[in-house]
Amino acid sequence: LTCILKRYKNRRLKQKGMETLMEVLKDKDCTINTPVVLGVQDSPIYGKGISIKPRVDGRKDSKHFENIYLPELLPLEEYDLIVVLISGGKDSIACFYKLLELGVPKEKIELWHHDIDGGHPSRRMDWKCTQNYMKALADAEGVKLRVSYRVNGFFGELYRIGASEPVEWVDPDTGEIKQCKLSSNYLKCQEIKEQCLEEMEDLLKEYGCRMKFPAKSPDLSRRWCSAYLKVMVADSVVSNLDRLEELGGKRHKFPAKGGTHQGRWCSGNLKAAVQDSVTANLEETKKDKKILIVSGERRGESAGRSKYNEIEIHRTNAEKRNHRIVHQWRCCIDYTEKDVWEVLKRHHVNPHPCYRLGWNRCSCAACIFSTPGLMKGFSEIYPDEYKELRDDEERLGFTLDNKKNLDDFICGAKSCLCLDDKQAVHSIKTGEFTVDDIFVDDWKYPVGAFHGSDGGSC
C-alpha cells in the first residue's frame, strides 16, 4: 500500500485562505493490484438523520464557486427524489449501487439516461446495445428508468440550421413521450418553415390547380406528388436557410475537444441541457421538491475532473422561484478505478459490452475523444458507421479530430478491439441485451479495465 501511495499525485485546490491537500491516483496508474480503499461496502445511513459531508471541502475561489458552495447534503431521507445520471458506464452504475448500500429505497431512486442519438431515423453515434443495456439494468433492479433526449440527437445537431430540436423524455410509468417547453427561437423557425409551404402553394396556383389525386404513372407531370411536393419544397426551404441560421445559428461541424460545453456541444447540448430541461419541466421535479442529482465523475479520470466539487448546489436549483431545492453529489469522485470495479464485482453486474471488447471508457462508440486505437476498433466493429463519419467529414469540410481526417488519425494505430467475448460481440453488433444478461456469477474484469482514462469525456 505504501509503494502505491507514493505514486499518487498531490494536488492543491486553492480556497479562501487555505489549501486542501488531495491524493489522487490517476486512472493510468491504477492496476488490478491496486488495493481497494473506498470501494468497500457502505453501511446504511438512510433514515438516521445523517448529513453527508465531502471528503474535501468545496471550492470558493471564484464568484461562481461561492454561489454553488454547499457544506453538506441534507440527510438522504429528506430528498423527495434521488436521480442517478446513468450512461451505462461503470462509474454511474457504481453510484447507483452505493445508494442502495447506503439504504436508499429503490422507489426513491430514478435512473436518468440521456439518449445521445435521440431517435434519429438512420444515424447512430452511440453503441447499438446501450439502450437495451440500460433497460435491462433498470428492469433487473426494479427501478424507474427515464430516458430523455434531444430530438434527432447527435446527427440532428451536427447538421442543424436554425434552432436546436426540442427535448423529450419517455414517462417510465406510461411510456408516453413528453416534450419540454419549446424555445421562442424554435417556434420562430417553425413559422418560417410553414411560411415556405404557404409560399409554395401560392406559387403552384399561379400555374394552375390539380384538385385530383396523382396518376400511377412514371410521367412526373402526371405523378405530380413527386415533382411538386418534394422537389419544390426543398427549393423553398433552401431559399429560407439564411433566416433560419440567423435565428438559431447552425452547427455543420463536429464538437470541439475542449473543456467547455459551448464548443464541446455533444456534452453541453445533448446531455447537460437535456437534463436541465427535464428537471425544469417534469411535474415530479418542477416545484416544491427537494432533489438530489447523483453523477459519476471521478478525480482520477482527468486533471479537469480532479478539481470538481464532491457536493454543490445544482444549476437547476430554484428555491425562490419554484421552491425547488436541487443538490448535486458526485458520490464516487474520490474512488480509484479499482474501487469502482469492486462495487460492480460485489453486485455481480455484467459490465457494458464495450468494456468487454477492449474499450476503457463507456462513452459514445465514436466519441470525439477516442484515441487512434479506440477509433481503429470502432472502424472494425462498425465499418459502415465509420465510412459514414468519413463521408460527413468530406461533406462538412470539417474533421472529427482537430488536425486530421479519420483515416489519417487511425493510420498505423493498434486496434483496441478484442473479439474473445462472443456474447459481447453479439450485443455490440445487434444491440441485443436482456435482463438475463445483466448479472453474472463468475464475474471477471473486462479486457478494457485498467487502461487509463484517455478516450472519453474529460
Predicted regions and their residues:
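Nucleotide-activated chemistry modules centered on ATP-dependent adenylation/adenylyltransferase
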Residues: C3-Y8, R12-C458
